[in-house]
Amino acid sequence: LPAFATEINWADLEAQSAETVAKGEFITVDEISIKMWMPTVLAAVELTDEDKEGGYIGYYMTEDESAAIAVVYADVDGMSLEDYKAALADNGATEVEDVTVNGLPAVTYVLEESDTACIAFTTEAGYVLEVAGSPKSDEGFAAILSFVMASIQGE
């Protein structure tokens, strides 16, 4: 994701990469009126009550379980994106960058120890929406993950 531009618009990607886009479909995250593109190679995994209590609102994994994308909606007590960014750095996140995705301000970052790339948005309700994917070191999966992140938009 370090190759991510600071301003990303799905319409630009869609025009350049119709073949890739055709290999997935938009899913809606009901809790927060957000939709995002998810490749068909990643299937939704049923969440347990424990997952839901942990803030997970979606989990998508390849059939061989070698790659996954998690969608988390967590209460951060109204923390601003700037405050969240500072907390990320304090907790070992690297490559923390400000981005704008389809008009929404966000932060991208990397968790090296778990080979995970993440994007986070704060919401008016005082929550943070995070989309995280692993393994980011897999070039093919990293490309798919960047598409997923670039597709996040309001409904």
Task: Annotate the PLM regions.
Residues 29, 44, 69-71, 93-96, ...:
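Generic structural motif
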Residues 82-86, 152:
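Acidic Ser/Thr/Pro-rich low-complexity disordered segments
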Residues 85-128:
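Signature of long, low-cysteine stretches enriched in small and polar/charged residues
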Residues 1-56, 114, 125, 132-155:
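N-terminal targeting sequences that direct proteins away from the cytosol to non-cytosolic compartments
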Residues 58-83, 128-132:
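A short acidic-to-branched-hydrophobic micro-motif
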Residues 37-38, 70-73, 119-122, 131:
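Short amphipathic beta-strand/extended segments with alternating polar/hydrophobic composition
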Residues 22-31, 58-62, 97-101, 109-111, ...:
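Short acidic-hydrophobic surface loop/beta-edge motif
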Residues 81-82, 119, 139-144:
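A short, polar/proline- and glycine-enriched secondary-structure boundary/capping micro-motif
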